[in-house]
């Protein structure tokens, strides 16, 4: 069988996937895996290959259950990964857990030994969290390699921010080391609008640049070691682990075998990461990294051939940008719910600047003990940041806003892909099938009958009204809770926000006037009662009520 690693990685994924579907019930999962692989055998007629695939699926089931059935014991060593205002996230033997109670003095990167505390199993599958540890007493362990890395990273981050200023320093730190915690929301929104938000989280692009720098200056072995150190320095992100494995396979194949298959390489990376972290396929960052790379591997050269008449640099930038989005767009419609129309502009104009900032920034991090050399690096970075700010200002003016997309759009894109493949295979009659889904996409985007969303929690009260191509939100909230309003505006794709409105203001809907401003006013009290309170407001969850007004009658949708 050609490219067996592709099939083995799919089998491992199926084992993990069905394990979560059937909530760790091993017996049902194994039976389903057996049935699937019997069908595979009847199709391929290859018994040895099918058995190996089945074993990989069983490996996925075992890995998943071993991960989530783990029970920490007193005296366990826990690594502190992330610290928030109200909780701390740590890892114990590769498993994530939430730490509570005695956590005020904990810092990221520290290694602690829990002397006393209670563990409560509270699994969050999509984040790989096995439960909560209520810590009573702990002992801080001596600094090891990873804690020293965390401390070094903090010092370097602070040095860049102090030298460049908070705004520019945070951009450099985000681009070079993937730490966007210092970044201002305005900068994040601008970069997101331009479709280059991936540059703020360390990706394979970053690691490839770092590897190339050290390979040119030194040797391949030194470059691999330096890349691994960069991997550790940036926190072992999925995208960098994937890129490191693929680079390692590429260099080893060049040296020992002379043949490199990119699809087998990415499949091996997928298999290794999923075996170690069987929940990874539920994390958006993992899927974005693999789907974008898969799109590049499969379609970059094909797109490049179609635009052969363009200059080579422009051809490369456009083909890379378009191919990386082929699988990301449908996936984003099911998860992120938003799409940047200006991603092509962002990638063409920004990626060269980002590349220079990353290269100079990494060199600056290495040479930061040398004051005068570091000052020269800071001067270069300042000028690059000025160029970046000017480019951002211009492109933001011409780049269209993010658009909100729903699942039906993703289904439409997938149908186009399927119909195109069938058309290429000679099934000409299927080429018009996406047109039927296009009608559904239109009616989904254009609200024929008015929709009303009712939201309420302890901090924010809001009514959202959508009609035709417009959407208005009326909300009542305290000034310090403004971040919730921003979240609502982004998640519901709001055109206009009216805050703390008094009395009734008419909204014209066909011949009728819908006089609903604050949902706690009498109009909706006559039709809707028993409001629930929620802790989180997000359209991606079910924390809202939806109503549709059809010919003056109100119907509850959810």
Regions inferred by a protein language model and the residue ranges of each:
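Hydrophobic core segments of transmembrane alpha-helices in multi-pass, intramembrane catalytic enzymes
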Residues: 7, 29-34, 223, 227, ...
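Flexible glycine-rich surface loops and low-complexity tracts that mediate binding to linear polymers
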Residues: 108-126, 131
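Membrane-interface helix caps and helix-loop-helix hairpins in membrane proteins
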Residues: 20-24, 231-240, 256-259, 275-286, ...
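Transmembrane helix-bundle segments that form internal channels/tunnels in multi-pass membrane proteins
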Residues: 1-77, 214, 302-457, 464
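Structural detector for short beta-strands of small beta-barrel domains
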Residues: 68-92, 116
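Short hydrophobic alpha-helices at membrane interfaces in multi-pass membrane enzymes
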Residues: 220-225, 258-272, 308-316
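Non-globular, low-confidence helical/coil segments that flank catalytic cores
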Residues: 101-106, 112-115, 144, 209, ...
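Aromatic-rich juxtamembrane segments at the membrane interface
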Residues: 14, 19, 133-247, 251-252
